[in-house]
């Protein structure tokens, strides 16, 4: 299946104001998280792809991925770009009003990739690192900034300094840092 700049062929995002685009071209979700959700949501059928992922990954958890890491899958090259902040559709899919909060608090967000080089991918293809951005913010760090440690100055500075972070996130974190600075100066 062709992996293109904006998505996998045939994949259509419903609301392009919050889904898709070059920094959210494809979504990966770790297979390692499914046992957690099976214990959290007993009786819920959780087949691969239940979280809306294009790729159910293995050995690519949030703490291991830095924004800016480049990986190959099949003939395509992707870059780690950002975490997932879920919308109401996740709660609707699971038929649980508390699903968004549970998802955020869990830190089990998965990752959005941009497509750096288009190519063909197939079921069973594995991700291989081409280059790492070890000084970049991890997806786990980004989750902390969003859900549990919003005013961590070290992480905010690191996020702002991460070259591959999408500009809208950089602006968001700069605004938060400015608010933080103004609160402390008064």
Where are these regions (language model features)?
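Electropositive, beta-rich accessory/interaction domains or terminal extensions
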Residues: 1-92, 98-99, 131-186
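Short loop/turn positions at the edges of beta-strands in beta-sheet-rich folds
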Residues: 59-61, 107, 117
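Loop/turn positions that initiate beta-strands
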Residues: 68, 118, 123-125
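A generic structural motif
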Residues: 85, 108-110, 118
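A mid-sequence, solvent-exposed acidic-amphipathic segment
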Residues: 97-114
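Hydrophobic, well-ordered secondary-structure segments
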Residues: 109-112, 124, 139
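Hydrophobic beta-sheet segments that form the core/acyl-binding groove
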Residues: 127-129
